[in-house]
Amino acid sequence: MVFRNNSNVTQEDHGPRYDWDEEEKNDILGYFFWGYVITQIPGGRLSEKLGAKIVVGTGLLSASILTLLTPVAAHMGYLWLVVARFCLGVSLGIHWPSTPPIATKWIAPADTATFMSHMTASSLGVAVTLPVCGYLIAYWGWASVFYVTGSIALTWSLCWFYLIYDSPEEHPRISTTEKEKLRLEIKPVNTSLKKPPIPWMKMLTSGPVWSVIMGNTCAGCTFFVAFNQLPTYMSHVLHFNIKANGLFSSLPYLGKKCSLC
């Protein structure tokens, strides 16, 4: 989304300009999602095996570095930027599937709905970031967006490694009382029990399962088309300046957050 805003800038004082056609711009945006898809299933399994702390933390750290290096990749050429975007998608694709393994050890069943609503409403971050990025581009150039957001993400990734642990038992800084409270509220999963076979045929021939798949697919496609193309529409069709573009492009994400509160 950050790059989408940057690619709409046409004024010279906003930073270097690159002679990419529309197909190349869409490739730069699209390859992020190819990388994002690849790590969805492996991300969850890696978190179960290695722990979400190291898996998510590594993804955050690598994504931060890639964000900081994005202006350099753009200067080096189109293919370098495509590779950087693809790797960024790989790094960030592990986050959502890595959440359940750690959440089941920290979040009590009574708080699960609240926790998931906040996770789903993470679009608040987009709603805040878009207007800020618009002003950053207007005053300091498009590269400043990557340096500022990359630096914030880098700081957060270091905080993640320091603050987050895979289970209450591993955390050295919470009290015994809190550990006992979590132990009583969260029932541990008995991994020694024999797992029943997965009913693949029943799942693949189930109408409700396919309804959920199709619903999520259509919603996801619609969301990400708007996610990528809304700033372009604001710029090329409505002719908003970069500050107004960021502000108005953020409104759908603010509405999404409000609807989930």
Would you name each region that the model predicts?
Residues 111-139, 144-153, 252-260:
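Glycine-rich segments within core transmembrane alpha-helices of 12-TM secondary carriers
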Residues 77-85, 211-212:
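Short hydrophobic/alpha-helical segments at membrane-entry points of transmembrane helices
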Residues 1-37:
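Extracellular/periplasmic helix-loop-helix junction of adjacent transmembrane segments
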